[in-house]
């Protein structure tokens, strides 16, 4: 099996000197130092990603939804039939899904990548039709997992080369929270009963079936945690693997990524294994009620921007947070400095960088 180093170049840090300069610059603006709290943190993070203070406006946000079906859905782990995946993909293509509305409101555009939906189709983004039931068989073959990785890399390169300045991966696929929970449990050593939630709204019996499927999947890779490509091949799916490669390649290309809920964050965990340090380029858009989500966020060292109780997927929570990220950048660009506005500083004010954005939100590595 190919090692990740053969697929992904080294991930660099966002510019640490620019991060320090951005924090210092925040303290010159017409406000008490640190008073905008996490908005300051996010603005500084984007400045560090772009390598300049103030940062450039985020004019080309792009949402890419990775769609695929899952063999494990036949185990009764979802409240909806697998046919809904293809129907929802068509709704997105028609512009009528929640993610389309959220994207339009936030000034973003949406691309739907059909990686492994369960229908007869061909195309450069297709890996296979659905995937194996991960509790008893591999999700895909060795050739297919490499194909999924290469597709994710190619999609990231296409979007960045076309001018995208911030990326949001989204998910679509009935049953996809099952491989997501299995990945999160595997990489964080959390127990199946801890990472399994209600997904699309399953009842108690459905939850028990889902726990069993996740338990069995995790058992199959119990000695393979240090081999992320093999783990992906065995217990993820083509769409999750392509998404992970997309996220990892965005980090390689120095492009920030806003993460959505449990499925996307599971892919982000895998991305950070494939391209160590990729997490330095992540923003956690929101917190999902899925119990695996905060576990994955903690493992990545991320604090979500909003908590609206959203559990739709599609990239919807990240899209809801996108206006905050754009506003954080606009504040740095459009606010006056105290000198320009003729505003007196507070007596004895400490205007050093340390008195700026609240500690712990943008870490020194930096991670939001």
From Swiss-Prot:
Residues 344-368 are annotated as: Disordered. Keywords: Cobalamin biosynthesis, Glycosyltransferase, Transferase. GO terms for biological process: cobalamin biosynthetic process. Its EC number is 2.4.2.21. The active site is at residue 314. It catalyses: 5,6-dimethylbenzimidazole + nicotinate beta-D-ribonucleotide = alpha-ribazole 5'-phosphate + nicotinate + H(+). GO terms for molecular function: nicotinate-nucleotide-dimethylbenzimidazole phosphoribosyltransferase activity. Transmembrane segments: none annotated. Catalyzes the synthesis of alpha-ribazole-5'-phosphate from nicotinate mononucleotide (NAMN) and 5,6-dimethylbenzimidazole (DMB). Belongs to the CobT family. This is Nicotinate-nucleotide--dimethylbenzimidazole phosphoribosyltransferase. It comes from Corynebacterium efficiens (strain DSM 44549 / YS-314 / AJ 12310 / JCM 11189 / NBRC 100395).
């Amino acid at each position: 099996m190919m090692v990740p180093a053969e697929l992904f170049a080294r991930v660099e840090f966002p510019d640490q000197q620019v991060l320090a300069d951005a924090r210092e610059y925040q303290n010159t603006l017409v406000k008490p130092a640190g008073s905008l709290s996490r908005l300051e943190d996010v603005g500084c993070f984007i400045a560090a990603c772009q390598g300049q203070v103030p940062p450039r406006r985020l004019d080309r946000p792009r949402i890419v939804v990775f769609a695929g079906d899952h063999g494990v859905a036949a185990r009764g782990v979802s409240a909806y039939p697998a046919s809904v995946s293809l129907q929802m993909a068509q709704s997105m293509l028609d512009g009528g899904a929640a993610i389309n509305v959220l994207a339009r409101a936030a000034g973003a555009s949406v691309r739907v990548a059909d990686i492994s939906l369960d229908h007869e189709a061909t195309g450069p983004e297709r890996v296979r039709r659905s995937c194996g039931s991960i509790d008893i068989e591999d999700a895909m073959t060795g050739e297919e997992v490499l194909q999924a990785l290469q597709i994710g890399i190619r999609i990231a390169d296409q979007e960045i080369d076309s001018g995208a300045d911030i990326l949001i991966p989204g998910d679509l696929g009935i049953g996809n929270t099952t491989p997501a929970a299995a990945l999160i449990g595997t990489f964080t050593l959390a127990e199946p009963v801890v990472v399994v939630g209600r997904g699309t709204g399953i009842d108690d019996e459905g939850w028990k079936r889902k726990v069993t499927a996740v338990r069995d999947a995790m058992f199959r890779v119990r000695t393979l945690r240090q081999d992320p490509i093999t783990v992906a091949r065995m217990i993820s799916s083509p769409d999750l693997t392509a998404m992970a490669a997309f996220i990892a390649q965005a980090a390689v290309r120095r492009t920030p990524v806003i993460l959505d809920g449990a499925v996307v964050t599971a892919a982000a965990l895998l991305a950070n294994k494939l391209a160590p340090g990729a997490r330095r380029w992540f923003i956690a858009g929101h917190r999902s009620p899925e119990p695996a989500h905060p576990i994955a966020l903690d493992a990545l060292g991320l604090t979500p921007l909003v908590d609206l109780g959203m559990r739709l997927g599609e990239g919807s929570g990240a899209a809801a947070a996108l206006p905050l990220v754009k506003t954080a950048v606009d504040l740095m660009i459009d606010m006056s400095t105290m000198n320009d506005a003729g505003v007196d500083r507070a007596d004895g004010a400490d205007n050093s960088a340390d008195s700026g954005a609240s500690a712990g939100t943008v870490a020194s590595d930096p991670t939001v």
